[in-house]
Amino acid sequence: MGLGVLCLALVLLGVLQSQAQDSTQNLIPAPPLISVPLQPGFWTERFQGRWFVVGLAGNAVQKERQSRFTMYSTIYELQEDNSYNVTSILVRGQGCRYWIRTFVPSSRPGQFTLGNIHSYPQIQSYDVQVADTDYDQFAMVFFQKTSENKQYFKVTLYGRTKGLSDELKERFVSFAKSLGLKDNNIVFSVPTDQCIDN
């Protein structure tokens, strides 16, 4: 009996391992950055400040695993060199988690790369592009990274407040689908009052 249980455990381990590999091997290809919309006449000063993450879509997002996605906030703080210090504040367990990084301006206004990228040895490239914003209510930001030779991309729907209109959410879904994403790759966050307002 002990040998049978061991064989069953090994088979299950192999199945789980192959499923985990399949989830990253079947990534929807990232669109070329040049084909992603870029906010015309991007204003760095107006974009800074706090944004709440209302929606998230990406080739590594799976609705069935992330259906109870908790809202977090991201603060863009403009620096003298036109880079942003970017702080994301997330709820983790009973505490708050802070993720701080720098977005350095790229060749076109509204495009950025991850500063100090050598501090992230698993990341080969990381690009950020503001696709659409009115600065006062919403923004749609495209992120693309190459990590361990796999290309991931996501689109974030930001709101200056925790709630956005159904029309803006539908616009976000249409934008995500125009990049090749499916309904299963799109989630909306559950608002929280913990951590993210401070």
UniProtKB/Swiss-Prot annotation:
Annotated tissue distribution: Detected in the ureteric bud in embryonic kidney (at protein level).
Residue numbers of Pyrrolidone carboxylic acid PTMs: Q21
Protein localization: Secreted; Cytoplasmic granule lumen; Cytoplasmic vesicle lumen
Residues noted as binding a carboxymycobactin in the record, renumbered to the chain: Y72, S73, T74, K145, K154, Y158
Residues linked to a glycan: N85
Disulfide partners: C96-C195
UniProt GO BP: acute-phase response; cellular response to amyloid-beta; cellular response to hydrogen peroxide; cellular response to hypoxia; cellular response to increased oxygen levels; cellular response to interleukin-1; cellular response to interleukin-6; cellular response to lipopolysaccharide
One Pfam family recorded for the sequence: Lipocalin
GO CC term, one of those recorded: extracellular region
Keyword Nucleus: no
Binding residues for enterobactin: Y126, K154
Keyword terms: Apoptosis, Cytoplasmic vesicle, Disulfide bond, Glycoprotein, Immunity, Innate immunity, Ion transport, Iron, Iron transport, Pyrrolidone carboxylic acid, Secreted, Signal, Transport
Keyword Secreted appears in the UniProt entry: yes
Superkingdom of source: Eukaryota
Gene Ontology terms for molecular function: enterobactin binding; identical protein binding; iron ion binding; iron ion sequestering activity; protease binding
Signal peptide range: 1-20
Quaternary structure, from the entry: Monomer. Homodimer; disulfide-linked. Heterodimer; disulfide-linked with MMP9.
Task of the protein: Iron-trafficking protein involved in multiple processes such as apoptosis, innate immunity and renal development. Binds iron through association with 2,3-dihydroxybenzoic acid (2,3-DHBA), a siderophore that shares structural similarities with bacterial enterobactin, and delivers or removes iron from the cell, depending on the context. Iron-bound form (holo-24p3) is internalized following binding to the SLC22A17 (24p3R) receptor, leading to release of iron and subsequent increase of intracellular iron concentration.
Record-stated family: Belongs to the calycin superfamily. Lipocalin family.
Protein known as: Neutrophil gelatinase-associated lipocalin
Organism this protein belongs to: Rattus norvegicus
